[in-house]
From Swiss-Prot:
UniProt key word Coiled coil: yes
One Pfam family hit: Prot_ATP_ID_OB_N
NCBIfam families, A to Z: pup_AAA
Family: Belongs to the AAA ATPase family.
One Gene Ontology biological process: modification-dependent protein catabolic process
GO cellular component, one term: proteasome complex
Record key words, sorted: ATP-binding, Coiled coil, Nucleotide-binding
Protein name: AAA ATPase forming ring-shaped complexes
Gene3D superfamilies: 1.10.8.60, Nucleic acid-binding proteins, P-loop containing nucleotide triphosphate hydrolases
Biological source species: Bifidobacterium adolescentis (strain ATCC 15703 / DSM 20083 / NCTC 11814 / E194a)
A molecular function GO annotation: ATP hydrolysis activity
């Protein structure tokens, strides 16, 4: 082989190597393209797949197995408001399908899969648990529906007042919903108020001690004489005269002589329990008494204090408000009557308008004891002011707290023109004067003393030295309280104002403020 042939052979070998390299690259590119095409085809097949339908399993309609061991079964399902009988896939065991569970239907409406129970959906309140396990549930508008329990829920204990979520078809209760947080409606506290902190209410305190404290602390004697303690006490009278303080002091006093520790005070504002949704107020009442029973179970004395009771338990059929009282009052009475077996629960109500409370609440056997907490007289006012105006305060020289209290109370209770608030006209057309003393309360007395203390603080800031509380500051405080009370009468409704303040209720037809 000559040199020319060798060069030709080398050139051909080089060309062959290049072609092989290109061929290898083309093979790799073709392989990648094939993989991409396969992936794209799979994606297209997935996108082209028919939609599947969610439904709620109701029951297995039929199920049998042929001679070849193949299952032939159908199921009743609900998709929204639509009920259907559909086949069950042969590879899905019909006996494992549970009522209330979510199932998937393919494009041919065949049950192909069972999912977990849905945890979402409309929330309903349980009104009643039927003997066969079905539930009577209601929505916020009071519309009642009869539903079955899902397989999971059927194993749990359910009672009236519980909340459940229901499926879209409104045929199944799926699961329990945690109760609402109603802690803001019920204030639970251990009060530190004692009867010694309350002035001017000795008679009322003695009566409530006899009615409440004595049965708790002398149970053996009550049993010996076959005497049952009262279920409840109603404190009524004009506002600001110590009804709430008395209730707190009772809860505190009940702990004396017991081994259970301090008493528990559950404070409820009547208007806060009113709810526009039917059944919600009743649920809150049940919740309050349930909590009282829980606290009383360990031996602690429990006071359920319902303030402004007239707003919650109005006389049924009066037309003063909506018909909500027709259901709230019976629910309250049911719970109150149920407290009979509990030795540690006492209901105390407070109201400015006893005339608006349903008579069934006030009858013997329920709120047995009714105590009027009236406006303080001169003697009671002196006892009240002693708690707020003491010798420990910076007082004017050569004068003690007792002397200042006497001057202050005499000024407030003066029956002369400089304390003349207005004239009121009764239903006979007779006019009579109303003085500051006629509308004074324990809260007003405290407010007057606080005004004088505030003046002293401001004066101390201005002068740079502690200002003394004297007759002048107290007189200024009374003048300001008198002026604000008089101005508030300008737009007052005569009948409502007289009822709230206990001045000839129902008879006042006109108010003529002093100019």
């Amino acid at each position: 082989m000559n040199d020319h042939d060798e060069e030709t052979l080398a050139s051909l070998q080089q060309a062959n190597d290049q072609l092989m390299a290109k061929n290898h690259a083309l093979v790799k590119a073709l392989s990648r393209a094939t993989q991409e095409m396969t992936k794209t085809k799979a994606q297209l097949n997935q996108l082209a797949g028919p939609p599947m339908t969610f439904a709620t399993m109701v029951r297995v309609h039929s199920a049998k197995t042929d001679g070849q061991g193949v299952q032939h079964a159908s199921a009743e399902v609900a998709a929204g408001a639509r009920r259907m009988i559909v086949p069950i896939a042969a590879n899905l065991q019909a006996s494992r399908l549970e009522p209330g569970r979510t199932v998937l239907l393919n494009e041919n409406m065949v049950v192909v899969s069972q999912l977990d129970t849905d945890t979402l959906g409309a929330v309903r309140s349980v009104r009643q648990v039927c003997d066969d396990g079905r539930l009577l549930v209601a929505d916020g508008g009071g519309n009642v529906t009869l539903v079955r329990c899902s397989g999971t829920l059927a194993k749990q204990a359910i009672s009236a007042g519980d909340r459940v979520n229901v499926d879209a078809s409104l045929r199944f209760a799926l699961s329990l919903v945690p109760p609402e947080n109603d802690d803001d409606l019920v204030l639970e506290e251990v009060p530190d108020v004692t009867f010694a902190d309350i002035g001017g209410l000795d008679e009322q305190i003695e009566r409530i001690r006899d009615a409440v404290q004595m049965p708790f602390q002398h149970r053996e004697l009550f049993e010996r004489y076959d005497l049952k303690p009262p279920k409840g006490v109603l404190l009524y009278g004009p506002p600001g005269n110590g009804k709430t303080l008395i209730a707190k002091a009772v809860a505190n006093a009940l702990a004396e002589g017991t081994d259970a520790g301090s008493g528990v005070f559950l404070s409820v504002k009547g208007p806060e329990l009113l709810n526009k949704f039917v059944g919600e107020s009743e649920r809150l009442i049940r919740m309050i008494f349930k909590r009282a029973r829980e606290r009383a179970a360990d031996g602690k004395p429990v006071i359920v204090f319902i303030d402004e009771m007239d707003s919650l338990l109005r006389t049924r059929g009066t037309g003063v408000s909506s018909d909500v009282e027709t259901t709230i009052v019976p629910q309250f009475l049911t719970e109150l009557d149920g407290v009979e077996s509990l030795d540690n629960v006492m209901v105390i109500g407070a109201s400015n308008r006893i005339d608006m409370i349903d008579p069934a609440v006030l009858r013997p056997g329920r709120l047995d004891v009714k105590i009027r907490v009236d406006r303080p007289g001169i003697q009671q006012a002196t006892q009240i002011v002693r708690h707020y105006l003491t010798d420990k305060l910076p007082l004017s020289p050569n004068v003690d707290a007792k002397a200042l209290i006497g001057v202050l109370v005499n000024d407030i209770y003066a029956q002369d023109e400089h304390r003349h608030l207005c004239d009121i006209c009764d239903d006979h057309g007779q006019w009579r004067p109303v003085y500051l003393a006629d509308v004074v309360s324990g809260a007003v007395l405290k407010n007057i003393v606080d005004r004088a203390k505030t003046y002293a603080v401001k004066l101390s800031i201005t002068t740079g030295q502690a200002a003394a509380i004297g007759i002048n500051l107290l007189a200024k405080a009374v003048d300001e309280e008198y002026g604000e009370t008089r101005d508030a009468l300008l737009d007052a409704d005569p009948e409502q104002w007289s009822r709230i303040n206990g001045l000839e209720p129902g008879r006042v037809t006109g108010i003529r403020p002093v100019a």
